[in-house]
Amino acid sequence: MNIAQEVAVLQYLDIQQENPNAPNEELFNRTAESSLLLEPIEQDQLKDLVEEWMHDSNKSDSKLLSNQVSQNDNDARKNLRKRLRNDVLKDLAEEIQGCEKKLESLYEEVAKAKAKAVEDQLALEEADKEAKKAKTEAPVEAANKSLRSRKKTPEIAAPANIEPEVAPTTKTPKKRAALSNEEKQSLKKFQSAMLPMLDNISNHRFGAPFSHPVNRKEAPDYDSLVYKPQDLRTLKNMIKEGNITEVDELYREVLRIFANCKMYNGSDPANAMSIWGDECFRYTEELFDIYRQASTRSQ
């Protein structure tokens, strides 16, 4: 018998024990209508199952199915019920173990499928980068060959009395006003808290692509799609130089990094960079929430 049939027989024995004077037909009828059954069953089928189980248990005795029984027969019924209950519990335990093994197997298959999808996506991205690189390098190499084939034009020396024009140097940032001791302490406290936080984001398992500026050779169209590039290394330098001194300002700039990732790579859940950006974004929010909560408690 399967578990559902064993439960039906066990339910019959329970109802028989609770109603020792009820006729068998009523017991079979009440058992068939019980809400505790695992699946519907007809009275005739139930009767056959009860007789079959008693026969298999070497307890086949018509008196056990009737209500005219002695105390010894009642004890026999109780023993039968106990044995059947143990069988049901054993079968249920085995069924549960089987289900758990199936679930573990399914989880492993899902994890492998996800890993394979990420691996395939990375392979596609790498192939796409190689194709773009080859497409970009081909005309550049042709142009270089053309230039090398031309005759060099002699350089024209500048007159001795005219100094050559010096290319303008990079503008130096304006000197910041001298900070008071209180402002210096506040800035130092801000730096000691925020720089390690940015390091934690960089050290995240998916944080490497966001730790430095995007390589324009690998993404030549990046500036045409992203209005204001940003990266964690640049933010660390801005903090060290005192150009960012507020938590909210830093938070906005960090979010800009992941917004740029979405802008350039799209929101396709199968895109590896999109997945990495989402993971780092959630991790960043957790870090800033922890910092804000700690700051609130310390006030």
UniProtKB/Swiss-Prot annotation:
Keywords: Activator, Bromodomain, Chromatin regulator, DNA damage, Nucleus, Transcription, Transcription regulation. Its main location: nucleus. One of its GO terms (biological process) is DNA repair-dependent chromatin remodeling. Pfam families: Bromodomain. The keyword rRNA-binding does not apply. Residues 54-79, 130-152 are annotated as: Disordered. One of its GO terms (cellular component) is NuA4 histone acetyltransferase complex. Component of the NuA4 histone acetyltransferase complex. Component of the NuA4 histone acetyltransferase complex which is involved in transcriptional activation of selected genes principally by acetylation of nucleosomal histone H4 and H2A. The NuA4 complex is also involved in DNA repair. PANTHER family: BROMODOMAIN-CONTAINING PROTEIN 8 (PTHR15398), BROMODOMAIN-CONTAINING PROTEIN 8 ISOFORM X1 (PTHR15398:SF4). This is Bromodomain-containing protein 1. The lineage of its organism: Eukaryota, Fungi, Dikarya, Ascomycota, Taphrinomycotina.
